[in-house]
């Protein structure tokens, strides 16, 4: 019996591994399942816990980020990154998949990255908006179009999950995978 959801997840993980290997993380590989002490889907990215989700049936960022955070602690990683394959973006567009972090961790990581590379990295922050798949895709697509960002800028959208209106540390920060990789590399992760 073929397990289609598992096959889709495996395919998404493999696409992320290929992208990471081509962009400064040559030791990235799919991690075998470890049950209750799961440490994320991708290993070989020292200091990072990377969880990958195939989201054709909708975004479940809250539960997925909770899972990513638990796996981050299990793996003793510095940061947890949730990579989401959205509907309509196949393996050839892995660079445009969503990379999501909790606001508190993103603030720490981005401060580190900007401190390491102040002349070559700036983060363009999107206005906080409520969590909505259509809005997210439209803002990311529009924000990364040619002419919207300087070569040294990264776009980080801000999504407010329900009940977090006054707590920016709990907001979700959403980038494309290509922008997240540039951010973590600027913060000192991956090969130099």
Model feature map: region roles:
Residues 1-192:
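Catalytic phosphate/metal-binding cores of nucleic-acid and nucleotide-processing enzymes, i.e., regions
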């Amino acid at each position: 019996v073929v397990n289609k959801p598992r096959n889709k997840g495996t395919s998404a993980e493999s696409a992320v591994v290929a992208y990471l290997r081509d962009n400064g993380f040559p030791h990235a590989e799919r991690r075998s399942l470890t049950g209750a002490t799961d440490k994320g889907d991708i290993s070989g990215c020292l200091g990072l816990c990377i969880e990958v989700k195939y989201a054709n049936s909708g975004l479940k960022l809250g539960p997925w980020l909770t899972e990513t955070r638990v796996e981050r602690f299990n793996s003793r990683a510095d940061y947890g990154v949730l990579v989401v394959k959205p509907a309509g973006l196949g393996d050839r567009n892995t660079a445009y998949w969503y990379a999501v972090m909790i606001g508190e961790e993103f603030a720490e990581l981005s401060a580190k990255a900007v401190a390491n590379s102040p002349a070559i990295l700036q983060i363009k922050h999107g206005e906080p908006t409520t969590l909505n798949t259509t809005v997210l895709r439209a803002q990311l697509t529009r924000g990364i179009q040619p002419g919207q960002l300087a070569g040294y800028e990264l776009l980080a959208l801000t999504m407010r999950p329900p009940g977090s209106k006054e707590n920016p540390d709990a907001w979700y920060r959403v980038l494309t995978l290509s922008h997240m990789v540039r951010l973590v590399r600027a913060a000192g992760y991956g090969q130099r």
